[in-house]
Amino acid sequence: ELRQKVFETARDWFSFPQHERLHVTVADAWHTLETLPVASTAMIVTDLYSADRMSPLQAQRRFIKACARALKPDGWLVLNYHRMPEPDGNLLRELKRQFPCLLTFKSKTNNWVIYGCNRAFDPWQIPDAVLKALEEQLPVGWPALMKKIRVL
């Protein structure tokens, strides 16, 4: 997160989870990505927006490459876009180059969330018991979410 106050508001008012394995960096995203060690991060969640628009950085190939470089071999990149990248555009091509597994869904607010990982993953083979356990750790309505996901 770029602004400390945004993080504090999320933590104090919107049930932002706190856990020893979760680290939030309050800094410029590009600078942070450039300084992360190779294969050091399990998950990167990007939601780079100002008050009126998405940051152009989030749609750049260099940003996607930097995220891929920082992720562990079994790591995940989660991107929030205000519209789906063009099917034949540079951004989606770069995502496919860096992440053999790409999943997406359209949120209630009409944003597109893209999940990328470096390993084979079949989201439809997850047992209900695993989804229930995941729901206890991160309550986002996993069973309903899994019904919306599609492969890119």
Where are these regions (language model features)?
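SAM/dcSAM-binding transferase cores
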Residues: 93, 108-152
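The AdoMet/dcAdoMet-binding core of the Class I SAM-like
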Residues: 1-69
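Conserved beta-strand signature within the Rossmann-like core of class I S-adenosyl-L-methionine
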Residues: 74-81
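Conserved Class I S-adenosyl-L-methionine
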Residues: 65, 89-110
